[in-house]
Amino acid sequence: MWQVCNLSRLDISLVTKHNYTMKPIAFLRHSHYAVNRALRCLMAGAAVCSFSGLNAQTADTLSRIPENVRMKSMINSTHIIGAGEEGVMRDSLERLLTTFYVDQFRHFQDPRAPYFMFMSKSSKIAMGVGGLVRIRGYYDWNGSIPINGFSPYSIPIPKDPTSMRRLAATPSGTGFFVTLLGNHTLLGDYMAFIQVDFSGYNGKDLKLKKAYMQAGDWTAGYATTTFEDTKAEPSTIDGAGPNGINSRTNVLVRYMHTFKGKWTVAGSVEFPSSSIAADGEYTKACSDYVPDMAAFAQYQWAGGASHVRLSGLARVLTYRDMLQARNHNIFGWGLQLSTVIKALPQFNLYGIASVGHGHESYTTDLASDKFDLVADPGQKGRLYAPMAVGYVLGAQYYFTPSLFADIALSEQRYYPKDNPEDSQYKYGLYGAFNLYWDITPRFEVGIEYLAGKRMNFNKTSGNANRITAMMMLSF
């Protein structure tokens, strides 16, 4: 007979093949990283999986961290539909759901696990179909941005007197997803995930957001680039996010592994998509044929609640010189240093700094146009990779596990060879302050103030202000 059970009583026993066992409620009494470590041991079939790095005092402290309490409430809100034994199904699904929530590349705007999960009779496979309704309403004044996302690059210069104020709302971000969680003798724990939402053309058309598979240390599919550190990004209600981050989704194959509980390394081969400003007369963009390569090395402490990461990106950008009838390959690269620091159990600090040449299509602001390769001044038929620099500073404070606030300050700067002295983008500034309230584990509301500025090389500038309100239901 089919039955439905709630995960309100959490009981997890994670056992490696040498019988190293985590006690009940281990995911709560250890940080996100500790749980992830246990799961990776299971997926890899590791011979030894020790939790000696977390003493009783540290575990007790981590159990009170608001993020862990919040994750516990999310997992509690998932119901099981299956024909197996209730206790076995509950334990198995809770362990599988941890792989869903404890993810290096999980974004703060990603949907929560489905409200209902179907469990196989063997309790080794769970599948759920979920949805997310997200409505944002916003009001711009003293200059408005003509798009839903708050992007400083899109601030009009000069101000349009017919659009000094703007009231609008968007369902962009509303969507559906399917996830499959399971365990196999050879693969270990695995996950498949497909997500679509209505953030396509005009903010309403259906768009594929993610489609990937994970098994052990491997990920393959359409997923977040390895160059991005989502955990170091302060959360925003605004869909665009801080303009200084590097954010992109690519078709990729990634390997990621953690050593001795402190170090994580990852590398990926990612299918390219360059953005080249060829004029079609003297220069022409060539098809991409060399994959982008991304990697990072990360050191974590405080049970994984804090980390510092160095990320790198390498790519080849190809164009044709129409005057000399020759193709040229330009090397593009990017470096990023990012961190999240848990200064107090309820207080987090965030920081990101990046620099590169020819990586502009990975940034938030400069991806709005073609900046990977631009015209070389004074040399017809030649292109080069300009430099761009970005940074993000942020903080987050939990008043309670269900009420928290974020602040974010960000800048993106563009450095061409020569000062063009025209209306070309020079830098953009972005600021956000918000407040979130989880009324229930699946119903969230929030409000946010946004301020932005765009400065051009000819010293003309524009600014914009926005108040955004959001409500979100995940099911």
Regions found by a protein language model. Give the residues of each.
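Outer membrane beta-barrel
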Residues: 120-149, 161-274, 289, 294, ...
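Outer-membrane beta-barrel "beta-signal"
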Residues: 437-439, 463-475
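Detector for outer-membrane/organellar transmembrane beta-barrel domains
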Residues: 299-419, 425
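Bacterial Sec-dependent N-terminal signal peptides
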Residues: 1-61
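Sequence/structural signature of outer-membrane beta-barrel proteins
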Residues: 140, 183, 197-203, 227-229, ...
